[in-house]
From Swiss-Prot:
The gene is mmpL8. It is a multi-pass membrane protein. Was identified as a high-confidence drug target. This is Sulfolipid-1 exporter MmpL8. Pfam families: MMPL. The lineage of its organism: Bacteria, Bacillati, Actinomycetota, Actinomycetes, Mycobacteriales.
Length: 1089
C-alpha cells in the first residue's frame, strides 16, 4: 500500500476549451517553499513525526481533564477587594470554611419528626468526625438557638451549612466536597429524609462535572456537522477525511501541550476546554480548506500533485501564517485580563491555534502528497464562481443600495445588543436535573432566597472599638445602612435582634430616669402629711426645749445647794482621812440630820427633774453642729454623765445617804451610826468621782457649762424648726417639679422611638461583661442585666463573639436584604450600602476605619466590575492588533479602519441576535462572559476573512476598484463561504452542551460567523470599497519609504501595471498568480473552490 501511494500519478488536465497561461517558476526563497520541498520528498517522515509526538505526549503527560482538576480556575484574582476583605474577616474572627460552603438540604414532605431528628444527629456526628474535610458545621445539635433559623416555617426541611477547606473551586475544596457528598449519601440512605447538596461548592462541582460529560457529545456533534459540510463542498470522502485526521492529531498534541502549561501553573476550566475544542476544529478546517482549495487550483492549471502541493503551500502558507498569527496574538493578549476564565482561555486558545497551524502546513500537506499521487483528492468542477461574480456585479452597480440595506440590518440588530441584561448567577447555567439545581429548588420552596447567602458589613479600625462612643457611632452607621432600599434587617452587637437595642437607647434610659422621678414625686405627694408633721414636730421640739431650758435653770440652783451641802459634809468629816476620828463627832448629829434633810430634798428634786436630759442628749447626739463645736461637745459629755448617774443609781445612792443622815438618833450608838455613814459616804464619793465631781469647784464649772449648752441648744432648735419648715416648703415644690420632669421624660420614651431620635449608649462595664472570658450571670449587677433586653450573659457573650473580633479592632454586621443575592439588583445595592456606611464615618470614632461589604453579591459585583474592565481591555487590544496587521498588510489606512468598523458592527449584530433569541424569546439573561469571549473570537476570525477579501481587492484594484471588486468577490466568495460555514458549524456544535453559558456563547459565535460570511464580507465591505474608491489605499507619505514592506518585496509600477486590462473570460478564470507577487500568492483566483 505504501509503495502504491508513493508512485506519482498524473493529474487530469483541465478542459481543452479553456486557455491557460504558462506557470511562472516558484521562487526558491522563504520558509514555505523549502518546507514544501521537504514534505514532498519525505511525507512519511512528517507523518511519523506527528504520530511519534502524539504517542510520546499522550502517555507521559496527564490528560487535560486531570490537570483541570488539579489546577482549577479561580473566578476572581487573588487581590480582588472582596477576596481581600473576606480573608481579613476570616483572620480577624479566627474562622475557617467561609470561602467554600456546601449546604445540605434535608427535607421530609410529611413533616419533620423524631425519626428525622435522629437521622439529622447521626449525620452531624458523622460530619464532625471528618475533621479533614469539614472545618465548619452550623448545626442545632451543638448550638440549639440555631434550630429556629435552620428549620423551615412549614417544618418540612432543615439546612445544614458545611464549611470546606480551601478556596472555592480549588482542588482541596473539590476533593473535600466529593467526600462530604459521600458521607451525606451514606448517612441519609434508608431514612425518611431526602438529602440534596447545594450551595456555592456544589455549583462549582456540578459545573465541572457537566462540562466533562458534555465534551464527548459536543465533539461528536461537531464531527458530524463537519463531515456533512465537507462532503457538500468537496463531494469526495477522501478529501473530506484529510482535514479531520489533521485536526484529530493536532487536538491530541494541543491538549497535552496545554496540560504541560497547566502543570506550570496555568489554570484550566472545563468551559475553556470546550471552546478550545470548537476553536481548533473550526480554525483547523478553515486552514485545510484554504490549502486544499489552492491545491485544486494548481491542479486545474495542469500541475501534477507534488507540484500543486508545493505551490499551494508556498502561496497559501503565508496567508495561513498571517491568519494564525493574528488569532494567536489576539488570544495571547488576553493574559492581561483579570478574570480567571478570560485570563486562562487566551493562552489555551493561542497554543491550540499555533498547533493547528503547524499541523495544517506540515501534516496536511504530507497527507495530500500521499493521497494526491493516487488521484484520490482530485478537484471537481467549480459551481459557485458564476454566482459570486454575478453578486459582485450587482454590488458594483448599486453600492449605495447594498450598503444601506446591509447596514440597516446590522445596525438594527446591533441596537438590540444595547438591551442586553447580563446574568452573573452560575446556577442558571446548569441544567435543572443536576444535584445543586435540585437543592436550590428545595431551598426556594422552603426558605427565603437570601437565607444561606450571608452578607456582612465589615469594619476594621486601628483602635479598639469596644467603647461606648465607638458603639454609638457604629449604631448610627448601621442605622443609615438599614435605610438603604432593599435592606430588610441589619444584625450585630448593637442590634442583636435586627433593630437597635431598646435598653441602650438614651431615650429609653431617660424614660427609666423619668419613671424613677415619677415614683419619687408620687411618694412626696403621698407623704405630704408626714412632711407637715415633721414641720410641726420641729416646732414642738423647739417649744419643749425652751421649757427644758427653764427647768434646767431652776434645777441648777438646787443642784448647787446639794453640792454645797456635800462639800460641807466632806469638809466636816475629812473624807477618808477622818474615818478614825468619828468617835468624837456625836456633837455633829444634829447637823447631820439637818444635812440629810437638805440632801434628800435636793436629790429628790434633781432626780425628778432630769427627764429633760434624755431628749436634750438625743438632740445633741444627732446634731452635726454640736459635734463641730468643742464647747457643746464637752457639755454633751457632762450631760451624758448626769443621765448615766440617774440611770445607774448614783442619785439613788445619794438619796440613801440623805436618809441615813436623817435617821440619826440620839439613842444610836455613835459607832453604829458612823459605821453606816462610812459605807454610804464611800459609795457616794466613788459615784461623784465617776461623774467628775471629786472637786466641788470643777462640778460647779461643769454645771454652768451644761447650763450654757442647754441655752444654746434651745436657741438652735428654734433655728432648726425654721429650717425644717423651709425644707418642707421646698420638698413640696420639688415634688411638683419632679412630676413635670417625669412627664417630659416619659413622653420622650414613648415618642422618641426612632433610632435617629433615640441615641445610643452602652456602659463600658457592660461591654467588659460582654467580652470577658469568665463572667457569670450572678456576678453581673442587676442594672446591667436590665440593659440586656432579655438576653442572658451567655447569649450576650455569643452575640459579642459573633460580631466582635477577639482583639476588638474588627466588627461586622449581618445584612439581610429583600433581593435575590444572585441578581444584578443585589450587586447594585452594594454600592449604596458602602456609600451609606462611609457617609457616617467623618468626625466619629470610625473616621479612620476601613469599611467593606463581604458576601456572594459582592463577589458577583466584583466579577461584573472586572468583566467590564476586561471587555474594554479586550476590545482595545484586539482592535489595535488587527488594525496594525491590516495596515502592514495593505500599506493603507482607510481600508483597515472601515474593516475594523465592520468587524465591530458584525459582533454587535450577532450579540443583538443572541439577545433577541435568549432574552426576548426564551426569557434568559445573557451570561456575563459572553461579550468578552465572543468579541475576541469573532474579531480574530473575521480578520482572516478580511485578509482574504481586502488583500485580493488590493491586487485586483490595479485596473480600477470597481472591476477589482467584481473579480475579488468572484474569486474569494466561495472560499469565504466555505470557511465561514465550517467555522460556524464548529461553533454551533457547542450548542449541544448542557451549560447555558456555553450554549449562548456558541449561538452568538455561530450567528456572528454566518453574518460575517454572507453579509459583511460579501455585501457590506465590497459596497464600501466601491464608494471609497482609490482612497482605500491612502497612506501618509511619511509611511512610504521606497523599500518599506515587512512581509515581502514590493513590485515596481511597471510590474503592477503590466497585466492587460482585459482578458478573455476563460483565460481570466484560469490565469495563475504571479509567483513573485505576495498579494497574488495570498489571494488569487486559485483560492476559489
Amino acid at each position: 500500500m505504501c509503495d502504491v501511494l508513493m508512485q506519482p500519478v498524473r493529474t487530469p488536465r483541465p478542459s481543452t476549451n479553456l486557455r491557460s497561461k504558462p506557470l511562472r517558476p516558484t521562487g526558491d526563497g522563504g520558509v514555505f517553499p523549502r518546507l514544501g520541498r521537504l514534505i514532498v520528498r519525505r511525507p512519511w517522515v512528517v507523518i511519523a513525526f506527528w504520530v511519534a509526538l502524539a504517542g510520546l505526549l499522550a502517555p507521559t503527560v496527564p490528560s487535560l481533564d486531570a490537570i483541570s482538576q488539579r489546577h482549577p480556575v479561580a473566578i476572581l484574582p487573588s487581590d480582588a477587594p472582596v477576596l481581600v476583605s473576606t480573608r481579613q474577616m476570616t483572620a480577624a474572627f479566627r474562622e475557617a470554611g467561609l470561602q467554600s460552603v456546601a449546604v445540605v438540604v434535608l427535607s421530609d414532605a410529611k413533616g419533620l419528626g423524631a425519626a428525622d431528628e435522629r437521622s439529622y444527629k447521626e449525620l452531624v456526628d458523622a460530619l464532625r468526625r471528618d475533621t479533614r474535610d469539614v472545618v465548619m458545621l452550623q448545626d442545632f445539635v451543638t448550638t440549639p438557638p440555631l434550630r429556629e433559623l435552620m428549620t423551615s416555617k412549614d417544618n418540612q426541611a432543615w439546612i445544614l451549612p458545611v464549611g470546606l477547606p480551601g478556596d472555592l473551586g480549588s482542588t482541596q475544596s473539590k476533593q473535600a466536597y466529593a467526600r462530604v457528598a459521600d458521607i451525606v449519601e451514606h448517612q441519609v440512605a434508608g431514612s425518611t429524609l431526602t438529602a440534596n447538596l447545594t450551595g456555592p461548592a456544589a455549583t462549582v462541582a456540578d459545573l465541572n462535572l457537566t462540562g466533562q460529560r458534555d465534551r464527548s457529545r459536543i465533539e461528536f456533534a461537531i464531527t458530524i456537522l463537519l463531515l456533512v459540510i465537507l462532503l457538500i463542498i468537496y463531494g469526495n470522502p477522501i478529501t473530506m477525511v484529510l482535514p479531520l485526521i489533521t485536526i484529530g492529531m493536532s487536538v491530541v498534541v494541543a491538549q497535552r501541550l496545554v496540560a504541560i502549561a497547566g502543570l506550570a501553573g496555568l489554570g484550566i476550566a472545563n468551559q475553556s476546554i470546550i471552546f478550545m475544542s470548537g476553536m481548533m476544529v473550526g480554525a483547523g478546517t478553515d486552514y485545510a480548506v484554504f490549502l486544499i482549495s489552492r491545491y485544486h487550483d494548481y491542479l486545474r492549471q495542469g500541475a501534477d500533485s507534488d507540484q500543486a502541493v508545493k505551490k499551494a503551500l508556498t502561496s497559501i502558507g503565508k496567508v495561513i501564517a498571517a491568519s494564525a498569527a493574528t488569532v494567536a496574538i489576539t488570544f495571547l493578549g488576553m493574559v492581561f485580563t483579570q478574570l480567571g476564565i478570560l485570563k486562562t482561555v487566551g493562552p489555551m486558545l493561542g497554543i491550540s491555534v499555533a498547533v493547528v497551524f503547524f499541523a495544517a502546513v506540515t501534516l496536511l500537506p504530507a497527507l495530500m502528497v500521499l493521497t494526491g499521487r493516487r488521484g484520490w483528492i482530485a478537484p471537481r468542477r467549480d459551481l459557485t464562481r458564476r454566482f459570486w461574480r454575478s453578486s459582485g456585479v450587482h454590488i458594483v452597480r448599486r453600492p449605495k443600495t447594498h450598503l444601506l440595506a446591509s447596514a440597516l440590518v446590522l445596525v438594527i440588530l446591533a441596537g438590540c445588543a444595547g438591551l442586553a441584561r447580563y446574568n452573573y448567577d452560575d446556577r442558571k447555567t446548569l441544567p435543572a436535573s443536576v444535584e445543586s439545581s435540585i437543592g436550590y429548588a428545595a431551598l426556594d420552596k422552603h426558605f427565603p432566597s437570601n437565607l444561606i447567602i450571608p452578607e456582612y458589613l465589615f469594619i476594621q479600625s486601628s483602635t479598639d472599638l469596644r467603647t461606648p462612643k465607638a458603639l454609638a457611632d457604629l449604631e448610627q452607621m448601621v442605622q443609615r445602612v438599614s435605610q438603604v432600599p432593599g435592606v430588610a434587617m441589619v444584625r450585630g452587637i448593637t442590634r442583636p435582634a435586627g433593630r437597635s437595642l431598646e435598653q441602650a437607647r438614651t431615650s429609653w434610659q431617660a424614660g427609666e430616669v423619668g419613671s424613677k422621678l415619677d415614683e419619687g414625686s408620687k411618694q412626696i405627694a403621698v407623704h405630704t402629711g408626714d412632711i407637715d408633721k415633721l414641720a410641726g414636730g420641729a416646732n414642738l421640739m423647739a417649744s419643749k426645749l425652751g421649757d427644758v431650758r427653764a427647768q434646767v435653770n431652776r434645777a441648777i440652783s438646787t443642784v448647787g445647794g446639794l453640792i454645797d451641802a456635800l462639800a460641807y459634809l466632806q469638809d466636816l468629816l475629812g473624807g477618808n482621812r477622818v474615818l478614825g476620828e468619828l468617835e468624837g463627832a456625836e456633837k455633829l448629829i444634829g447637823s447631820m440630820r439637818a444635812l440629810g434633810d437638805t440632801i434628800d430634798a435636793d436629790a429628790s428634786f434633781v432626780a425628778n427633774n432630769t427627764e429633760w436630759a434624755s431628749p436634750v442628749l438625743g438632740a445633741l447626739d444627732s446634731s452635726p453642729m454640736c459635734t463641730a463645736d468643742p464647747a457643746c461637745a464637752s457639755a454633751r459629755t457632762e450631760l451624758q454623765r448626769l443621765v448615766t448617774a440617774r440611770d445607774d443609781g448614783t442619785l439613788a445612792k445619794i438619796s440613801e445617804l440623805a436618809r441615813q443622815l436623817q435617821a440619826t438618833r440620839a439613842v444610836q450608838t455613835l459607832a453604829a451610826t458612823v459605821s453606816g455613814l462610812r459605807g454610804a459616804l464611800a459609795t457616794v464619793i466613788r459615784a461623784m468621782g465617776s461623774l467628775g465631781m471629786s472637786s466641788p469647784g470643777g462640778v460647779r464649772s461643769k454645771i454652768n457649762l451644761v447650763n450654757k449648752g442647754v441655752n444654746d441648744l434651745a436657741d438652735g432648735s428654734r433655728q432648726l424648726a425654721e429650717g425644717v419648715q423651709l425644707l418642707v416648703d421646698q420638698v413640696k415644690k420639688m415634688g411638683f417639679g419632679l412630676g413635670e420632669a417625669s412627664a417630659f421624660l416619659l413622653a420622650m420614651k414613648d415618642t422618641a422611638t426612632t433610632p435617629a431620635m433615640a441615641g445610643f449608649y452602652i456602659p463600658p462595664e457592660l461591654l467588659s461583661y460582654a467580652t470577658g472570658e469568665s463572667v457569670k450571670a450572678e456576678t453581673m449587677p442587676s442594672e446591667y442585666r436590665d440593659l440586656l433586653g432579655g438576653l442572658n450573659v451567655d447569649q450576650l457573650k455569643k452575640v459579642a463573639a459573633a460580631f466582635i473580633s477577639p482583639d476588638g479592632h474588627s466588627i461586622r454586621y449581618l445584612i439581610q436584604t429583600d433581593l435575590n443575592p444572585f441578581s444584578t439588583a443585589a450587586m447594585d445595592q452594594i454600592d449604596a450600602i458602602t456609600a451609606a456606611a462611609r457617609g457616617a464615618q467623618p468626625n466619629t470614632a470610625l473616621a479612620d476605619a476601613k469599611v467593606s461589604v463581604v458576601g456572594l453579591p459582592v463577589v458577583l459585583k466584583d466579577t461584573r466590575d472586572y468583566s467590564d474592565h476586561d471587555l474594554r481591555l479586550i476590545i482595545a487590544m484586539t482592535v489595535c492588533i488587527v488594525l496594525l496587521i491590516l495596515i502592514v498588510l495593505l500599506r493603507a489606512i482607510v481600508a483597515p479602519l472601515y474593516l475594523i468598523g465592520s468587524v465591530i458592527v458584525s459582533y454587535l449584530a450577532a450579540l443583538g441576535i443572541g439577545v433577541i433569541v435568549f432574552q426576548f424569546l426564551l426569557g434568559q439573561e445573557m451570561h456575563w462572559s459572553i461579550p468578552g469571549l465572543t468579541f475576541v473570537i469573532l474579531v480574530a476570525v473575521g480578520a482572516d476573512y478580511n485578509m482574504l477579501l481586502i488583500s485580493r481587492l488590493r491586487e485586483e484594484a490595479v485596473l480600477g476598484v470597481r472591476s477589482g471588486v467584481i473579480r475579488t468577490v468572484a474569486s474569494t466568495g466561495g472560499v469565504i463561504t466555505a470557511a465561514g460555514l465550517i467555522m460556524a458549524a464548529s461553533m454551533y456544535g457547542l450548542v449541544f452542551a448542557s451549560l447555558g453559558s456555553v450554549v449562548q456563547g456558541a449561538f452568538v459565535l455561530g450567528t456572528g460567523l454566518l453574518l460575517d460570511t454572507f453579509l459583511v464580507r460579501t455585501v457590506t465591505v465590497p459596497a464600501i470599497a466601491v464608494l471609497v474608491g482609490q482612497a482605500n489605499w491612502w497612506l501618509p507619505s511619511s509611511w512610504r519609504p521606497a523599500t518599506w514592506w515587512p512581509l515581502g518585496r514590493r513590485r515596481g509600477r511597471a510590474q503592477r501595471t503590466k497585466r492587460k486590462p482585459l482578458l478573455p473570460k476563460e483565460e481570466e478564470e484560469q490565469s495563475p498568480p504571479d509567483d513573485d507577487d505576495l498579494i497574488g500568492l495570498w489571494l488569487h483566483d486559485g483560492l476559489r473552490l
